[in-house]
C-alpha cells in the first residue's frame, strides 16, 4: 500500500461548479454522491451527517463559504460581503462541537474581507477553499508518518469511530496513522469498535480498511476493555473533534471509556488531529459544547425500533465525550507531537505560527 499516493476513497470533491459529498449514511451498502450547489445544502448535509468527521466538515464548510460568496455576488453585486453573512451563520450552526467548522469559516471570512467588493469573488473564494482541502491532505500524510513512528513492530491497535478518508480530505487522522504503520509492517492486527449508535466503526472504518486490503476485527463497544485485558492491543488510536488548550479531547462518544480502559490495562492512547482541531480559546474540556442528537438514533437501528414502544422508554444521546488530558499519552498533529499533553505542550505547537 502506497500511502503517499493514497486515493482509495474521496469523501468530498469539487466538480461541475458544485460540492459532491459521498453520502456516508448509505455506506457500506450504496456509494452515492450528493451534489450541494449552495451553502444551505452544504449546511444541511453536515447536520444530517452526509459528511462527518471534524476535518472533512471543515473542508466542506470552506466550499460552502465559497458557494455563499458566489451566490451573494449574483444577488447583491458589490454588496456581496454583507450578503454572504447569513449563509455563513447557517453553516456555523450545522454542528456545534467540531471546531474545524468554525476555523474554516473564520479563515474564509477573513480571506473574503480582503477581496475587492466590486469584483466577482467566486474564483478567489474557490481557490481558498481548495487550499484548505489540499492542506488537509498534506497534514494527513505528515501525521500518518509521525504517528506510525511511535508504534513498535508487531503491535495490535484499537480504533474508535471513523477517522479515515471519509472523515478528512485525505489519508485520515488516526486511520492515516494505522494505514501508514500497516504499510511499514509495524501493525500486526487492527481492531475497531463498532461505535454505536451510527456504527461508524463497522459501517465506515471496516469498509475503508477492507478497500485497502487491511484485515480488521470488529468488536462491540463494550468489549474494548476485555480485549485490552488479553494483551492483544498496545495502542488505542483515535481522532478528535475538538482539543482544548489544556489537552482535553472531545471525540466520538465512547472514547472516554476507551481511554479509561487503556489506562487500566497499560495500553497507550494516541490522539491524532490537525492543529485546526485545537481550540486555544477553550481552556478545558468542561467548556466544550457537546452536541446531543435525536433519541431515535438510539431507540432505532436500521430503520426498525429496537426498544419497547412505550412513553416510559427514552434515550440519552450525546454524540461526543471528553477525555481528560491526563489519560492521553500523545497527541499527534501536522506540526509536531505532544507527549503527556498539557497547556504548555499544546501552546508550543503554535509558537511561530502566523
Swiss-Prot record:
The record marks 161 as: Transition state stabilizer. Its EC number is 5.3.1.23. Pfam families: IF-2B. GO terms for biological process: L-methionine salvage from methylthioadenosine. Pathway: Amino-acid biosynthesis; L-methionine biosynthesis via salvage pathway; L-methionine from S-methyl-5-thio-alpha-D-ribose 1-phosphate: step 1/6. Substrate binds at residues 52-54, 95, 200, 251-252. InterPro entries: IF-2B-related, IF-M1Pi, IF_2B-like_C, Initiation_fac_2B_a/b/d, M1Pi_N, NagB/RpiA_transferase-like. It is an enzyme of class 5 (isomerase). It catalyses: 5-(methylsulfanyl)-alpha-D-ribose 1-phosphate = 5-(methylsulfanyl)-D-ribulose 1-phosphate. Gene3D superfamilies: translation initiation factor eif-2b, domain 1, Translation initiation factor eif-2b, domain 2. Keywords: Amino-acid biosynthesis, Isomerase, Methionine biosynthesis. Catalyzes the interconversion of methylthioribose-1-phosphate (MTR-1-P) into methylthioribulose-1-phosphate (MTRu-1-P). Belongs to the eIF-2B alpha/beta/delta subunits family. MtnA subfamily. This is Methylthioribose-1-phosphate isomerase. It comes from Halorhodospira halophila (strain DSM 244 / SL1).
Amino acid at each position: 500500500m502506497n500511502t503517499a499516493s493514497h486515493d482509495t476513497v474521496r469523501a468530498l470533491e469539487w466538480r461541475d461548479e458544485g460540492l459532491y459529498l459521498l453520502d456516508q449514511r448509505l455506506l457500506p451498502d450504496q456509494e452515492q454522491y450528493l451534489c450541494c450547489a449552495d451553502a444551505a445544502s452544504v449546511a444541511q448535509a453536515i447536520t444530517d451527517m452526509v459528511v462527518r468527521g471534524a476535518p472533512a466538515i471543515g473542508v466542506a464548510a470552506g466550499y460552502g463559504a465559497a458557494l455563499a460568496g458566489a451566490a451573494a455576488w449574483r444577488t447583491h453585486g458589490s454588496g456581496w460581503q454583507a450578503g454572504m453573512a447569513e449563509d455563513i451563520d447557517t453553516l456555523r450552526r450545522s454542528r456545534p462541537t467540531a471546531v474545524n467548522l468554525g476555523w474554516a469559516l473564520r479563515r474564509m471570512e477573513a480571506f473574503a474581507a480582503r477581496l475587492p467588493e466590486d469584483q466577482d469573488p467566486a474564483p478567489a473564494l474557490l481557490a481558498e477553499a481548495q487550499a484548505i482541502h489540499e492542506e488537509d491532505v498534506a497534514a494527513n500524510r505528515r501525521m500518518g508518518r509521525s504517528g506510525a513512528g511511535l508504534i513498535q513492530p508487531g503491535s495490535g491497535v484499537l480504533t474508535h469511530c471513523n477517522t479515515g478518508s471519509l472523515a478528512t480530505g485525505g489519508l485520515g487522522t488516526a486511520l492515516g496513522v494505522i494505514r501508514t504503520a500497516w504499510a511499514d509492517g509495524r501493525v500486526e492486527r487492527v481492531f475497531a469498535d463498532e461505535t454505536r449508535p451510527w456504527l461508524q466503526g463497522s459501517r465506515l472504518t471496516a469498509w475503508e480498511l477492507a478497500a485497502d486490503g487491511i484485515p480488521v476485527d470488529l468488536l462491540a463497544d463494550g468489549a474494548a476493555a476485555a480485549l485490552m485485558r488479553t494483551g492483544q492491543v498496545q495502542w488505542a488510536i483515535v481522532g478528535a473533534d475538538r482539543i482544548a488548550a489544556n489537552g482535553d479531547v472531545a471525540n466520538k462518544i465512547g472514547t472516554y471509556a476507551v481511554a479509561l480502559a487503556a489506562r487500566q490495562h497499560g495500553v497507550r492512547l494516541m490522539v491524532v488531529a490537525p492543529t485546526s482541531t485545537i481550540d486555544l480559546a477553550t481552556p478545558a474540556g468542561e467548556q466544550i459544547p457537546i452536541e446531543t442528537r435525536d433519541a431515535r438514533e438510539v431507540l432505532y437501528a436500521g430503520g426498525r425500533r429496537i426498544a419497547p414502544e412505550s412513553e416510559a422508554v427514552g434515550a440519552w444521546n450525546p454524540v461526543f465525550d471528553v477525555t481528560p488530558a491526563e489519560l492521553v499519552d500523545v497527541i499527534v498533529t501536522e506540526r509536531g507531537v505532544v507527549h503527556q499533553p498539557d497547556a504548555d505542550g499544546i501552546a508550543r505547537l503554535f509558537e511561530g505560527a502566523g
